[in-house]
C-alpha cells in the first residue's frame, strides 16, 4: 500500500473534476494512492446541445451509462485509475433536485437506507484504508440533495469506520483527516475578474449565483497550477455536462454561466488536526501532520 492514501466521495460523474480535479491530479502525480467513489451515475443531468439529447431521462434514459465512459476518461486524465461506484454502477440513481419527480424514485440516492449506505462506505474505507477522506459540506456545495446525502453518509461512515460497528464490513480503520471541498469567496471573485471574452451565449454569474464560502472558513489550500492541463482534459471528458472555453481558463455547464478554472482548490478540515501551516494559518497539504 502507498504511504499516502486519499479517498474522495462524490455524488455524480463530473463532481470529482469540477471541485477536486486538480487535487486528484496533483496527488496522483506525486505518487499517492487516490481513489474516487461515485454514488450515482448522474442520470438526471442536463446535457449540452442536441448531440446527447436522446440520452436524457425523459428520452432513452441512457445518460447514466454514457457518463460511466466520461468518468472513466476523466479519471484517466487525472491519473486516478478506474471508477468505483457505491455498491456497483447504477445501484443508486441520481435524485435530481428537491421536489422533482426523480427524487421520489425508490432507487434515488436520497431514498437509500442510511444504515445500508453507511455500511457500504465503511466497507470502502476499510478496504482502501485512506489517511484522508474528502466529501461535501452540509449544504452539498450548491444544495443538490445527492450532495447533501453524500455529506451525511460519509460523515457517519468516517465516524463508524474505526469502531466495532458494521463487523461484516472489514477490519476497523481510523481516518486521520476528513475535509469538505469548498470554493473560497475571494478566489472565486478574483477568478471571475480575470475572465475576458466569453464564447457566444455564455454570461458571467450574478453576484452570489455561484456557491462559495467566506475566506475565514477555509483551512487548507492546494496549489494545482502544475496540473491544470490534466484538469482541463478531465473537464472536457465530461462533454455532456461541461464545455471548456477556447481560452482554457473558464468553463460552463449547460446553463452557460462562465466559471473560472482556479489555480487553487479549497478545503475545510472537520476531523483531525491541522498540520504545518503558512503565515496565513493555512495548510498546503491534505496529508500535513498525518503519520503514515
Curated annotation (Swiss-Prot):
It comes from the Bacteria. It holds the Pfam family PIG-L. Keywords: Hydrolase, Metal-binding, Zinc. SUPFAM superfamilies: LmbE-like. InterPro entries: GlcNAc_PI_deacetylase-related, LmbE-like_dom_sf, Mycothiol_biosynthesis_MshB. Its cofactor is Zn(2+). Catalyzes the deacetylation of 1D-myo-inositol 2-acetamido-2-deoxy-alpha-D-glucopyranoside (GlcNAc-Ins) in the mycothiol biosynthesis pathway. This is 1D-myo-inositol 2-acetamido-2-deoxy-alpha-D-glucopyranoside deacetylase. It comes from Rhodococcus opacus (strain B4). The gene is mshB.
Amino acid at each position: 500500500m502507498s504511504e499516502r492514501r486519499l479517498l474522495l466521495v462524490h455524488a455524480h460523474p463530473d463532481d470529482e473534476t469540477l471541485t477536486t480535479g486538480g487535487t486528484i491530479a496533483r496527488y496522483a502525480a506525486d505518487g499517492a494512492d487516490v481513489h474516487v467513489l461515485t454514488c450515482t451515475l448522474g442520470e438526471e443531468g442536463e446535457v449540452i446541445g442536441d448531440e446527447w439529447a436522446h440520452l436524457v431521462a425523459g428520452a432513452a434514459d441512457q445518460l447514466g451509462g454514457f457518463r460511466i465512459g466520461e468518468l472513466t476518461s476523466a479519471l484517466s486524465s487525472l491519473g486516478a485509475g478506474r471508477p468505483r461506484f457505491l455498491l456497483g454502477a447504477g445501484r443508486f440513481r441520481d435524485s435530481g433536485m428537491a421536489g422533482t419527480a426523480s427524487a421520489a424514485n425508490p432507487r434515488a440516492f436520497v431514498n437509500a437506507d442510511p444504515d445500508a449506505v453507511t455500511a457500504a462506505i465503511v466497507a470502502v474505507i476499510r478496504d482502501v484504508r485512506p489517511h484522508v477522506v474528502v466529501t461535501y459540506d452540509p449544504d452539498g456545495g450548491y444544495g443538490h440533495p445527492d450532495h447533501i446525502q453524500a455529506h451525511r453518509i460519509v460523515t457517519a461512515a468516517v465516524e463508524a469506520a474505526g469502531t466495532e460497528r458494521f463487523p461484516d464490513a472489514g477490519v476497523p480503520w481510523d481516518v486521520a483527516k476528513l475535509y469538505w471541498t469548498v470554493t473560497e469567496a475571494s478566489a472565486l471573485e478574483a477568478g471571475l475578474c480575470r475572465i475576458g471574452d466569453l464564447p457566444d451565449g455564455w454570461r458571467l454569474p450574478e453576484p452570489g449565483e455561484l456557491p462559495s464560502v467566506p475566506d475565514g472558513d477555509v483551512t487548507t489550500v492546494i496549489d494545482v497550477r502544475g496540473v491544470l492541463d490534466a484538469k482541463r482534459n478531465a473537464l472536457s471528458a465530461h462533454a455532456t455536462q461541461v464545455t471548456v472555453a477556447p481560452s482554457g481558463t473558464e468553463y460552463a455547464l449547460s446553463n452557460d454561466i462562465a466559471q473560472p478554472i482556479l489555480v487553487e482548490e479549497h478545503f475545510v478540515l472537520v476531523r483531525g488536526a491541522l498540520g504545518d501551516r503558512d503565515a496565513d494559518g493555512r495548510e498546503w497539504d491534505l496529508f500535513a501532520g498525518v503519520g503514515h
